UniProtKB/Swiss-Prot annotation:
The keyword Transferase applies. One of its GO terms (cellular component) is cytosol. This is EEF1A lysine methyltransferase 1. GO terms for biological process: peptidyl-lysine methylation. Belongs to the class I-like SAM-binding methyltransferase superfamily. EFM5 family. The modification Phosphoserine is found at S2. Protein N-lysine methyltransferase that selectively catalyzes the trimethylation of EEF1A at 'Lys-79'.
Length: 214
């Protein structure tokens, strides 16, 4: 190749090269999030076909703090179809708590052994290592506002919990939730990153900070 051809080879400016490197770094982080980022709410995008709607940062924090207060140091927490609460819990507590995410969406398998594949249609189809009544609290957010979905999810909740239940679902499910799980509606109103058409509420079966703030 001649010197003339070398001179005519397109060269990126320092600014353009830096921008390109930043773009590639962002792409890599989305594919392979770092340890400090992998628990960020939204690191995995909502899939509306799976009826996924993430909580706002404030709501996820409130629910995570409620769970921590309810179980105490060293407690075991199950998040059933509530991935954004799991993420906030792990963001707050890297150690001293056992926290599991029960989820249909296998993208959350990035969380390793704490991910348990879960299909509410088969409510008790769980790994042998998940023993009955082995969690101090179960936080559940059934993906669909239907009696069938709540009933089947309730089977899972009752199998997992040692007693405490924190249910998040529509206000229209209040009567069914009380019948199935013995829970009562809290004054705290959860919010999502996107506004939902249906009013959403929290329900518990124990004395909760969600009625007075933590």
């Amino acid at each position: 190749m001649s010197d003339l051809e070398d001179d005519e080879t397109p060269q990126l400016s320092a600014h353009a090269l830096a921008a390109l490197q930043e773009f590639y770094a962002e792409q890599k982080q989305q594919i392979e999030p770092g340890e400090d980022d992998k628990y960020n709410i939204g690191i995995i995008e909502e899939n509306w076909q799976l009826s996924q709607f993430w909580y706002s940062q404030e709501t996820a924090l409130q629910l995570a703090q409620e769970a921590i207060a309810a179980v105490g140091e060293g407690g075991r927490i199950a998040c059933v179809s509530a991935p954004s609460v799991y993420q906030k819990l792990r963001e707050l507590c890297r150690e001293n708590f056992s926290i599991y995410i029960f989820e249909y969406d296998k993208r959350f398998a990035m969380y390793g052994e704490e991910f348990i594949f879960y299909d509410y249609n088969n409510p008790l189809d769980l790994p042998e290592r998940i023993a009955a009544h082995s969690f101090d609290i179960v936080i559940a957010d059934p993906p669909y506002l239907s009696e069938e979905c709540l009933r089947k999810t309730s089977e899972t909740v009752k199998y997992l919990t040692r007693g405490k239940i924190l249910l998040c679902t529509g206000a229209i499910m209040e009567e069914q939730a009380a019948e199935l799980l013995g829970v009562k509606m809290c004054t705290f109103v959860p919010r999502h990153t996107r506004n939902l058409a249906n009013e959403f509420r929290c329900y518990v079966n124990y004395d909760s900070g969600l009625d007075c703030g933590i």
